[in-house]
């Protein structure tokens, strides 16, 4: 299984429209960047590769990726550049299209979500071919990601 992670965005909801701030994947929680945390969880759960879709400040993301999983030691992280990253996450999803159509099992995730390890484990070990993680207590707001559920 491989993971495809969107990390190309400029973080408008966090930083505003005109920014040059670090990518959200480089925010630190308990001394680790989100990216470092994600890589640790994915490796522990047996994921073979992380395909990181980069754009905004890609050099910073790639430097962190190299620090976490050096290419010379087997290269767990492979990057794909989205030159149109300012156009939103749907373009990054399109950039990852080849990875998603490869026929491999794919875990698709955002880099800016603090995923609990137990939640990731449950998702990866699911017997279903396609599944989503859903917070049923979530109050929808302006967040652009929504999921409609039939009969429930």
Where are these regions (language model features)?
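Residues at the starts of beta-strands that form the adenosine-phosphate
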Residues: 2, 48-50, 76, 105, ...
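Short phosphate-binding loop-to-helix
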Residues: 60-105
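Short beta-strand/turn micro-motifs composed of small residues
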Residues: 7, 54, 110, 134-135
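Alpha-helix termination/capping residues and helix-transition junctions
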Residues: 44, 99-100, 125
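N-terminal glycine-rich phosphate-binding loop and ensuing alpha1 helix
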Residues: 1-61
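Short beta-strand-to-loop acidic/aromatic patch adjacent to the donor-nucleotide binding site
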Residues: 103-114
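Conserved core of the sugar-phosphate nucleotidyltransferase
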Residues: 116-152
């Amino acid at each position: 299984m491989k993971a495809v992670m969107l990390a190309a965005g400029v973080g408008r909801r966090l930083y505003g429209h005109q920014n040059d701030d670090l990518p959200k994947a480089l925010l630190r929680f308990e001394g680790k960047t989100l990216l470092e945390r994600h890589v640790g969880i994915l490796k522990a759960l047996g994921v073979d590769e992380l395909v990181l879709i980069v754009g905004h400040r890609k050099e910073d993301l790639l430097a962190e990726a190299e620090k976490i999983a050096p290419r010379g030691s087997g290269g767990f992280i492979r990057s794909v550049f989205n030159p149109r990253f300012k156009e939103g996450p749907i373009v990054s999803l399109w950039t990852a299209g080849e990875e998603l159509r490869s026929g491999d099992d794919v875990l698709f995730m955002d880099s800016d979500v603090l995923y609990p390890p137990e939640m990731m484990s449950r998702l990866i070990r699911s017997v279903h071919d396609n599944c989503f993680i859903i917070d049923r207590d979530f109050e929808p707001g302006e967040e652009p990601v929504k999921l409609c559920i039939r009969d429930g």
